[in-house]
Amino acid sequence: MEKQSSEELSIENKSAGFSRVEKPKVAEIQLQLLPYDVLRDILSRLSIKDVVRMSTLSGEWRQQRICHPDLVFTKDTFGISTDPDPDFTKTINAIIRDTDAKRASWTAEFIFNVESVLRPLWSTSTTTTTTLDKFAVEFGLRRKHKYYIDRWVSFSIASRAKHIAFDFTFDVDCAGPGCDQYKDVFPLCKLSGPSGSCVTSLVLGYVWLKLPPSFCGITNLRKLTLKTVSISEGDLQCLLLSCALLEHINIEWCSPLSSLRIGQELCRLQYLRVRRSELEMLELHAPNLTKFEFDEDLAQIVLSDCLRLSEATFVSNMRTQEFNDYDFDDLAFTFTELALPHVQKLFLLLNLDQVCSRK
């Protein structure tokens, strides 16, 4: 074997010496020196999934207590697989038990992960170290998870989030009035008054809304979406009237509703969508309404003073049927009962392939 040259030995010794020198904690030093706004900007350029992964792996990031401006928690955020993969060799009861056990495991994993992200951001039990633009939880939570739901609602308010969503319609295994017992009674009162003054957009799914007498509205709410929400006609009317700045309302699969009459003027309302809610009668005054979407459940519609209504869209609940299967006599009766004298365009979505329009 050839002898190493003196130059090679020198390089080798230097490398060995460098390896023994403790490397400075560059990442930690940089994080401590960078301004808060710069760190926040770095996080905002990443997906929430990447931020969660980075926070898990890096203690330095956790110590900074800096949060992504949009916290959107779904099963995909944490890579939770929700495929039940049933064993069809078992009995029906055994399959149901297995599915329930898996669902409980998914939910426990989801709650643990959300708590792991939020826990470092609490400075006290009622205040946080961060401000958010959006806070969303989209998972199949139920009334038995109320402790965490209420805690996360409090966090979203304390962080002054503008856009809040608690959509629990994922993996719904029970629908209808008999399933109200599984829905969380959502603490809407926490958003009422000054505490919810930052909220401009609210999405609620698979919850039960009961307005307390002290409810005084969500001051700056402009966009409201209710999906599979249990709410009485009186509470819905009170909710809409108490949010004076509402511009966009979306109501779908809500119950038990048969009619909605609002005598007072919704002067800011521009968009209204009512679908799959068995709401037979709708009457409201919205002078600035421009777009309206509805289905055949609405047998009577009275939109008084809607002089700016430029577009109305009828979406049939039987769109999966063949076009020739429609009972056009019933459809004609539906439209003779409508009071849309000022609409400029009426779109009829009758099945998946056809859109009929009348100008």
Language-model region placement:
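Terminal membrane/secretory targeting segments in land-plant proteins
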Residues: 1-24
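Leucine-rich repeat
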Residues: 2, 21-255, 261-263
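Conserved "Asn-ladder"/turn position within leucine-rich repeats
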Residues: 169, 207, 229-231, 254-255, ...
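C-terminal per-repeat helix/turn "cap" of leucine-rich repeat
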Residues: 214-217, 236-239, 262, 282-285, ...
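Short "repeat-start/strand-capping" segments in structured domains, especially the N-termini
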Residues: 219-220, 244-247, 265-270, 285-288, ...
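Repeat-solenoid scaffold signature
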Residues: 265-291, 297-302
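Extended repeat-based solenoid scaffolds, especially LRR ectodomains
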Residues: 298-359
